[in-house]
A protein has these predicted regions:
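Helix N-cap at the start of a conserved alpha-helix in ABC-type nucleotide-binding domains
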Residues: 40-42
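Conserved ABC ATPase signature
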Residues: 4-8, 12
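Conserved catalytic motifs of ABC-family nucleotide-binding domains
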Residues: 25
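C-terminal boundary and immediately downstream tail of ABC-type ATPase nucleotide-binding domains
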Residues: 96-120
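H-loop/switch region of ABC-family ATPase nucleotide-binding domains
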Residues: 65-66
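Catalytic Walker B motif of ABC-type/P-loop ATPase nucleotide-binding domains
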Residues: 29-32
Length: 120
């Protein structure tokens, strides 16, 4: 298709941006809020795309996001940064079971994660 950028959907723009970023085979890929403005179904597609690219191309990928669903879907090592300082880092399991009050307030603000924590 020969569409102008203004004619692309939000998900298509994200895919094009990712393709442009990896075309030169970088060692690192930085994704800043890759799911912002996307519906949940498209966000999952973008998460899967990032995961696939990371694994197949052996690219170290850093994802900056506030979307806890994305964090749990694609995060291997997760870091919580507040005011430019890394306050916590660890695995998904460590994130769910942590005792850091500030981190818990942020992570479990979502109803989904409140239920997850309650079931632990």
């Amino acid at each position: 298709n020969k569409l102008l950028i203004s004619e692309l959907s939000g998900g298509m723009v994200k895919r094009v941006s990712i393709a442009r970023a990896i075309v030169m085979n970088p060692k690192y890929l930085l994704c800043d809020e890759p799911n912002s403005g996307l519906d949940p179904k498209t966000a999952i597609i973008i998460d899967n795309l990032i995961q696939e690219i990371t694994l197949e191309s052996n690219i170290t990928t850093i994802v900056n996001t506030h979307d806890m669903n994305s964090v749990m879907e694609i995060g291997e090592v997760i870091a919580y940064i507040n005011n430019g300082e890394i306050c916590w880092s660890g695995s998904k399991e460590e994130l769910i079971n942590n005792s850091n009050t500030q981190l818990n307030d942020f992570v479990f603000a979502s109803k989904l994660f409140k239920r997850l924590k309650k079931n632990q």
